[in-house]
C-alpha cells in the first residue's frame, strides 16, 4: 500500500479498485511504450541523480520499491550523534515544523476566493506553530507585471497575513526548473509534442478533472526524422510520459486529502502524458510548483479544490525527481450569489472593492470567517484572533462550494 493511500485498508482497496474499473472503462490506444524493464532502469537512473537543488534537511525519504511507483513520504530525522544521551536516544523524533505557503499569481487583483485560500493556509500553519513562505507565481506573460505583484503583497500585509520567508519570484528560478527538466529528459521520460490546443480540442477527447483534454499520445512514438521535420516548422512543447494503461499497479496515484479524503487517479486514462514545458518555452505549472515546494521546504499545501485534480501529477513528478510529498488540503470554492465561481477576470469581489466597503481588515476577515463557518459569527476579528477558531473539522463539514451572501 502506498504511504499516501486511503486511511484504512478497506477504503484503500475500494479506492484502488474504483480506479482500475474507471481505467478499464476509459482505456484507449496509445503510442509505443517502453517495456517494464526499460522503464525501471530509467527510473533507477533518475533516482540516482538526486535532488534538483539543495533542500533544507527537514526530512528524509522513506522510499518504497521504485519499480512499483509507490509514493515517497517525508519522515522526521532522528539524531545519530555519538554523544546523544541515553535519555534522548530512545525518544521519538521531533516532528519537522509545518511550512505552509502563499503562491498567488499577479494576473489581477486578489478576489475574495483568493483571500479565503490565503487565510486558510495561514490559519492552518499558525495553528500548528508553523511558518509561511510567500512565492509569486509569475511565469506566464500575463503575470509579469511588477505593479500587480506589489499590489498583491500590499493586500496580504493589509490583511495581517504576514509571512516568514520570501517573497520569491518564479521568474528568478528558471535554472531550477531547467535542471529538473533535464533530469526527466536524461531518463528518457519526456518527448516533444507538436499538437496545438486547437488540435487537441478538435479531437473531441475526454477531459481531465482540470478541464484539459486527456492526451492520447499522438506524438509519443514519433521517429527522430519526423521530430526534426516538425521542429523546423513549429517549436514543440515537452510532455512527460506516464505509465501505460496496462500497467495499473504503476499507473494509479493515491493520496489522502485533508478535506476531501482518499483520492486516486489512473494517470494514463484520466490525465495522459502531460506538459512540463509549453511550446513558447514557459515551464508548466506542474513542474514549477513541485520544484519550488521542495526547495522551499513546504510541508503543507492549502489551496482551492479546483486544483485537486492537479495533485496526482504533482505527486508523480515528486516521485520521479526524488522530492518529498507535502500534505495536501484543498478547500471549497467561493461562489457568487448567482452561482458563478469568483474570477479575477470578472473583477468579482476584488480586494480593492472589499477594502473600500469594509474599511478595516478585521471587519472583512470577521465577515469572511463567519460566512465560511470558520468562526461562529461575523464579528470583526484579526487573523491572529481567528487562529483559535480554525479547525480542519470545520472545513471538512463545509466542503461543498460556498455561496457568498450580501453583508
Residue ranges and their predicted role:
Residues 6, 33-36:
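Intrinsic low-complexity, disordered N-terminal segments enriched in polar/charged/small residues
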Residues 65-208, 305-306, 310-323, 381:
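N-terminal Rossmann-like or analogous alpha/beta NTP/dinucleotide-binding catalytic cores
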Residues 172-187, 209-217, 237, 242-245, ...:
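Short secondary-structure transition/capping segments
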Residues 198-343, 350-355, 406-407:
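Active-site cores that bind ATP or allylic diphosphates and position pyrophosphate for catalysis
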Residues 39, 45, 49-108, 132, ...:
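Non-catalytic terminal extensions that flank enzyme cores
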Amino acid at each position: 500500500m502506498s504511504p499516501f493511500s486511503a486511511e484504512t485498508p478497506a477504503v484503500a482497496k475500494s479506492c484502488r479498485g474504483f480506479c482500475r474499473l474507471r481505467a478499464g472503462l476509459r482505456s484507449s490506444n496509445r503510442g509505443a511504450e517502453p517495456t517494464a524493464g526499460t522503464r525501471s532502469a530509467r527510473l533507477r537512473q533518475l533516482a540516482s541523480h538526486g535532488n534538483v537543488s539543495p533542500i533544507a534537511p527537514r526530512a528524509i525519504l522513506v522510499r518504497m520499491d521504485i519499480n512499483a511507483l509507490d509514493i515517497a513520504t517525508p519522515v522526521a530525522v532522528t539524531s545519530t550523534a555519538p554523544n546523544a544521551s541515553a535519555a534522548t536516544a530512545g525518544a521519538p523524533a521531533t516532528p519537522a515544523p509545518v511550512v505552509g505557503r502563499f503562491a498567488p499569481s499577479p494576473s489581477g487583483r486578489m478576489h475574495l476566493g483568493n483571500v479565503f485560500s490565503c487565510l486558510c493556509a495561514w490559519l492552518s500553519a499558525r495553528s500548528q506553530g508553523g511558518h509561511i513562505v510567500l512565492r509569486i507565481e509569475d511565469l506566464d506573460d500575463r503575470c509579469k507585471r511588477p505593479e500587480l505583484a506589489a499590489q498583491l503583497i500590499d493586500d496580504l500585509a493589509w490583511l495581517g497575513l504576514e509571512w516568514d520567508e520570501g517573497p520569491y519570484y518564479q521568474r528568478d528560478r528558471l535554472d531550477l526548473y531547467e535542471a529538473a527538466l533535464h533530469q526527466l529528459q536524461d531518463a528518457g521520460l519526456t518527448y516533444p509534442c507538436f499538437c496545438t490546443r486547437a488540435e487537441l480540442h478538435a479531437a473531441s477527447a475526454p477531459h481531465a478533472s482540470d478541464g484539459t483534454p486527456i492526451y492520447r499520445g499522438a506524438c509519443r512514438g514519433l521517429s527522430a526524422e519526423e521530430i526534426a521535420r516538425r521542429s523546423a516548422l513549429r517549436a514543440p512543447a515537452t510532455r512527460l510520459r506516464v505509465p501505460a494503461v496496462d500497467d495499473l499497479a504503476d499507473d494509479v496515484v493515491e493520496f489522502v486529502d485533508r478535506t476531501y479524503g482518499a483520492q486516486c487517479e489512473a494517470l494514463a486514462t484520466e490525465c495522459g502524458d502531460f506538459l512540463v514545458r509549453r511550446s513558447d518555452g514557459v515551464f508548466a505549472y506542474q513542474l514549477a510548483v513541485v520544484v519550488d515546494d521542495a526547495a522551499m521546504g513546504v510541508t503543507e499545501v492549502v489551496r482551492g479544490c479546483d486544483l485537486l485534480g492537479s495533485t496526482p501529477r504533482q505527486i508523480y513528478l515528486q516521485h520521479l525527481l526524488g522530492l518529498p510529498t507535502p500534505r495536501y488540503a484543498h478547500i471549497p470554492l467561493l461562489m457568487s450569489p448567482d452561482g458563478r465561481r469568483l474570477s479575477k477576470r470578472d473583477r468579482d469581489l476584488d480586494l480593492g472593492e472589499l477594502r473600500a466597503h469594509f474599511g478595516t481588515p478585521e471587519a472583512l476577515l470577521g465577515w469572511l470567517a463567519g460566512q465560511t463557518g470558520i468562526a461562529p459569527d461575523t464579528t470583526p476579528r484579526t487573523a491572529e484572533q481567528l487562529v483559535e477558531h480554525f479547525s480542519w473539522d470545520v472545513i471538512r463539514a463545509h466542503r461543498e462550494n460556498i455561496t457568498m451572501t450580501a453583508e
